[in-house]
Each structure stands twice: as C-alpha cells, then as structure tokens.
Amino acid sequence: MSFAVVVDSTCDFTQEEYKALDVHMVPLSVLIDGETFKDQVEITSEQFYERMANSEGLPQSSQPTPYDFEQMYNTLAEQGYEGVIAIHIAGVLSGTIESSRTAAEQVDIDVRVLDGARAGATASIALAVAEICKMRDEGATLDEAEAKAKELLAKAEFLVAPETLENLLKGGRLSADQVKNAS
C-alpha cells in the first residue's frame, strides 16, 4: 500500500528536503508587523528571524484550517495514495493537529494523524519523518510506519535554549524580574 507523509511547516526541512523525501507540507500562517505570510511558502525561516529581530512586537502564528488539510488529503487520494501519515506540532503548542484530525474525518483516504507532543516541533519531528519516509521507500506498510513513528515520537525530547530572553518577555512568558534574575 502506498502512503504519503504530511507535515506542517514547523517540521525542520528545507524545500529541497521536502522534495527529496516526497513529504507534503501544509503551512501555518505567521503575522509579523501587520503582514501575514504562509510559513515556508511566502517567507523563509531566515526572513522570519530577521524580521522578528527588527520587530517591536512578537510575531504570531495561526494554524492551517481543516479545509487546507482536506484539500491536501483529497489531492493525495487523487494522486493514487491509499493512506497518509500526518505528523504535526504538539497539540499543546498549536491547534494544527485538530485541524488535521477534523479534515481526516471528512475524506475518503485513510489518514493517521500523529501528535508530535514530546517532540514539540522542528528537528525532532523531522528525524521521525525521515525515518518513516525511508521505511515507505523500502516497502513498509502504513501500519508499520505508523508504529515506528509513534515509537520515535515517544522517545523524543524537546528542549529550548534561547540566546536571549527578550522575546519571552515580549510575549509575556517571563516577567521583567524573571529576565533580570536569569541574566
């Protein structure tokens, strides 16, 4: 059974890696200084971080809509895929996974939606995705790849070590006193 792999734009792949691994991406939207961009489509990571560094406020993101995922899943079904493994940013960080689950219930293709909860986002999810793509290319079934993805995601750790606490202060995650004490 051939299956597709779908991620959101928090997965830490370049455009070249998406293409080489045959991974399909549904972008989140980012809002910076009043402008909205489709993440990794209309703005690169480098452009995002540059604009964030020069912004007075903190950028915001919004999840893809269920319709965005429904379009992706229907397109994959039309292309002949019989199933999909979709791995997304942790549900505690974003509503992206709920949009994906809602869409999965509306389409005529077997979609397995996985929460990158322990992985959080980015590189940890990318490592799991790369492994299941390798399995897919070697003939693994959807069930086998799903089991491996769950195993890898359960082992993942997500740590953050920011160079500066400025954005945590701007976003209200830390108080001025906490930032001062951490310095």
What function would you assign to each model-found segment?
Residues Q40, S61-T65, H88, S124, ...:
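Catalytic cores of large soluble enzymes that bind and process phosphate-bearing ligands
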Residues P64-S100, A104:
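Active-site cofactor/cluster-binding pocket
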Residues A4, T10-H24, L28-L31, T96-Q106, ...:
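Mixed-charge interfacial surface used for oligomerization/domain docking
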